[in-house]
């Protein structure tokens, strides 16, 4: 009975991932969106309002650099620039589009900011850090086939990853809290952390590098791998979940 449940879980997760990736906006011709004209231009979109968080969506590629200077630049086909929306909402820099875009040369957003408290990405979009981010507390969120690549050194890092999305984390932290579900992949084996709390479910995979303690919970065909044996470890495996040293 358990094997049957695991099998159906994996089938559902794979179907979900296929649906998500087929619906993500990318450099693919679907026929319903706007085509770029091939004439690439760059615009300065630095807002007047302050922000410490970023939310990126709808297939856009964004890089973020921690810097004393504040700037936002958008590079894209000239006729697509007006459809790339940059605004600040309650301290969050929101990056999105108001139209679907099919065939284009590039759609890049470059952000520089001094304080970074949260990075969020969904709907096939991506965020990558240029340098090592530092601070007290950092929240990371990825969803719906998106990608988040972050190098950071914070006291506390809290990351959640779902619906076929991918996170690759590196750096250092005192406390690391991770949650992955619905066929997502959270790679944090290059992020050294004193205390790690990791939860993985529904066919997801998590990798970690705990130094002092690890509290791990894996269920429904999901896995958690740890690359270092911590001084304290607590494992909770259920419904085909696995927790192993790699």
Predicted features along the sequence, with ranges:
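Intrinsically disordered, low-complexity terminal regions
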Residues: 1-181, 185-246
């Amino acid at each position: 009975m358990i094997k049957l449940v695991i099998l159906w879980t994996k089938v559902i997760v794979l179907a979900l991932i296929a649906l998500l990736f087929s619906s993500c906006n990318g450099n693919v011709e679907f026929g319903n969106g706007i085509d770029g004209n091939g004439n690439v231009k760059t615009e300065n979109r630095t807002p007047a309002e302050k922000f410490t968080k970023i939310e990126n969506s709808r297939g856009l590629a964004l890089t973020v650099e921690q810097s004393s200077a504040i700037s936002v630049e958008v590079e894209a086909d000239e006729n697509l620039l007006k459809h790339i929306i940059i605004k600040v909402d309650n301290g969050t820099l929101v990056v999105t589009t108001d139209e679907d875009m099919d065939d284009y040369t590039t759609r890049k957003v470059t952000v520089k900011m001094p304080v970074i408290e949260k990075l969020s990405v969904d709907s096939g979009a991506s965020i990558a850090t240029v340098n090592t981010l530092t601070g007290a507390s950092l929240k990371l969120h990825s969803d719906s086939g998106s990608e988040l690549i972050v190098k950071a050194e914070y006291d506390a890092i809290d990351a959640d990853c779902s619906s076929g999305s991918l996170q690759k984390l590196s750096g250092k932290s005192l406390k690391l809290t991770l949650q992955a579900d619905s066929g997502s992949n959270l790679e944090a084996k290059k992020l050294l952390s004193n205390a790690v709390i990791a939860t993985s479910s529904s066919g997801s995979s998590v990798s970690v590098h705990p130094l002092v303690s690890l509290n791990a919970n894996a269920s429904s065909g999901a896995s958690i791998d740890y690359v270092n044996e911590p001084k304290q470890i607590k494992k909770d495996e259920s419904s085909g979940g696995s927790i192993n040293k790699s």
